[in-house]
């Protein structure tokens, strides 16, 4: 799951021409994997996942997590 989240981050960074850390930092990815949020609200409680990131990436992240339940 962590690798899939990193792959998502890498794709988004390339697509947006951003640095990887601007999409998701490694510690945030690990925390998402530990907490396994199920809703955008739960995802926004993960340290490092502010409102803007949840709005931009939340649905995609939650879809990835859904596969691992």
For every predicted segment, state its role.
Residues 1-69:
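Accessory DNA-binding and partner-docking regions appended to nucleic-acid-acting proteins
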């Amino acid at each position: 799951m962590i690798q899939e989240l990193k792959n998502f981050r890498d794709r988004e960074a390339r697509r947006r021409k951003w640095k990887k850390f601007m999409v998701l930092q490694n510690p945030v990815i690990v925390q998402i994997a530990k907490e396994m949020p199920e809703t955008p609200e739960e995802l926004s409680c993960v340290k490092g996942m502010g409102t803007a990131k949840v709005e931009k990436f939340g649905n995609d992240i939650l879809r990835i997590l859904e596969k691992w339940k």
